[in-house]
């Protein structure tokens, strides 16, 4: 064989071995490509949202009293009682019966007017409202415990990372990786 051919084969073999050696160094020295997720705990916040809850209710009112002292009932009762009392007895007894009838009638008229005033009512419909709170949960993120080799770390993420978190060439977590 020719010396130049042997030299060419030797240079080719040496170059191939050199490339293979450099490639194998990079493969064997390369660290992990993913961090293993040990746990991912959801972080939630309870949110109370206020709202108005209204309903219509029937309300009974007493009409305003125009004769608070019930004078009308007392006077009418006294007159009626006096007339009825005057029908009994004779002489001086008639006068006593008239006075007793007037007093009894006045009292009865007063009580009747009071009873009528208390039962003099009207109804209206009113809207009654109260504030109630609806509860809901808002997801804040996840507290993630991860492991790279023998080292363990914690981080808060806004999504569940699954079982692995990718690493960049420097061994740092890639957190903006869209899934």
From Swiss-Prot:
Cellular compartments annotated = Membrane
Q: What NCBIfam families does the annotation carry?
A: PRK11280.1
Report if keyword Cell wall biogenesis/degradation is assigned.
Answer: no
What the entry lists under InterPro entries is as follows:
Bact_OM_lipoprot/Surf_antigen, Gly_zipper_2TM_dom
Q: How does it sit in the membrane?
A: Single-pass membrane protein
Q: What is its main location?
A: membrane
The UniProt entry's sequence similarity note says: To Rickettsia 17 kDa surface antigen.
Transmembrane residue ranges: 5-25
The UniProt entry's GO biological process terms, in alphabetical order, are: regulation of single-species biofilm formation
This protein is called: Uncharacterized protein YcfJ
Q: What organism does the UniProt record list as the source?
A: Escherichia coli (strain K12)
The record's GO CC annotations read:
outer membrane
User: Which gene name does the record give?
Assistant: ycfJ
The protein's UniProt keywords, in alphabetical order, are: Membrane, Transmembrane, Transmembrane helix
């Amino acid at each position: 064989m020719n010396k130049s051919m042997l030299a060419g084969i030797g240079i080719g073999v040496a170059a191939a071995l050199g490339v293979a050696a450099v490639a194998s160094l990079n493969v064997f020295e390369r660290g992990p490509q993913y961090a293993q997720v040990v746990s991912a705990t959801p972080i939630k916040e309870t949110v109370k949202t206020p709202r108005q809850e209204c309903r219509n209710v029937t309300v009974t009112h007493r009409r305003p009293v125009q004769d608070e002292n019930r004078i009308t009932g007392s006077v009418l009762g006294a007159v009626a009682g006096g007339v009825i009392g005057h029908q009994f007895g004779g002489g001086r007894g008639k006068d006593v019966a008239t006075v007793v009838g007037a007093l009894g009638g006045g009292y009865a008229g007063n009580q009747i007017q009071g009873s009528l005033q208390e039962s003099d009512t009207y109804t209206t419909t009113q809207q009654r409202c109260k504030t109630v709170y609806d509860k809901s949960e808002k997801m804040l993120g996840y507290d993630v415990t991860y492991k790279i080799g023998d080292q363990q770390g914690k981080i808060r993420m806004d999504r569940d990372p699954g079982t692995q978190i990718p690493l960049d060439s420097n061994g740092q977590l890639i957190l903006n990786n869209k899934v």
